[in-house]
Amino acid sequence: MVEWFKALVLKTSEVQASVGSNPTLSATILPRLSRRVFYYGSAMLYFEYGEKELNYLKKKDKRLAAVIEKAGVIQRELYPDIFVSLVNSIAGQQISRHAKASVWRRFMELLGGAVTPQAIDAVTEEQLRGCGLSGRKAVYIKRLAQKVLNGEIDFGAFAAMADEEVIAELIKLDGIGKWTAEMQLIFSLGRKNILSFGDAAIQNGLKRLYGHKKITLALAEKYHKRYSPYASVASFYLWALANGDVEYERPRRNAEKI
């Protein structure tokens, strides 16, 4: 397992025991750290990249270079437990961020803070629905846990597999589409060459950066080729553009022709 996947697993109670007696730490560190532990079960890690990847992208694309210069290094958190990340993705489908947080909190309480295949297998679909999950989502999550327990899928094997092979395995699972699979590649496996055409924010970022009215699959593939082998890193800056997190004034001319 690559170094940045190693996580210090801390249960919320252990965090509280460590810093709860210190008023300053309790007021500042505990709310953030315990929230992250509560949701994901480990201390946070970040997608690993630096000057090498950024310099490559800046040389390849002057417009993207301008965004990188303004934004600086963008830190994105990693969630190396693929099982937990997939369950979280299924739970959050087609609901608001606020609703997802509420559902996930109750879900974690039901499982005693440990999102594992064994813990999910030990509860009923009715109990899962009681957390606010739809019947369909409850079924999908139970099936995912059972597949892991039965040895039908081995997330540990993904590290040695190509991106497309991982996607092919993930989309076989109920409730997991290509976009979710691509997000697992970036945010669980730390893969550096993913540009998700199915991501609306990526398309909006490309439109804003290059002046296109529409992003076709062929156009997205051309940009992917330009950014390769660091398309995931480029994606961070496209997301920032789409979300308005970085100011960028596109040159006043027609859309870029590539």
Q: Can you annotate each of these PLM segments?
A:
Residues M1-E3, V15-S21, R32:
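Short, positively charged low-complexity motifs
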Residues A7, T12, A17, T24-T28, ...:
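Ala/Thr-enriched low-complexity intrinsically disordered regions
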Residues I29-I82, N243-I258:
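Intrinsically disordered, low-complexity, charged terminal extensions of DNA damage-control enzymes
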Residues R63, V67, I95-S96, K100-D174, ...:
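Alpha-helical ds-nucleic-acid-binding substructure associated with the helix-hairpin-helix region
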Residues Y79-Q94:
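Alpha-helical scaffold segments that form or flank carboxylate-/histidine-based iron centers
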Residues Q94-S102, L149-I153, L189-I194, L241-E249:
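Short helix-capping/linker segments at secondary-structure and domain boundaries
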Residues L209-I258:
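A basic, often C-terminal nucleic-acid-binding module that engages the phosphate backbone, implemented
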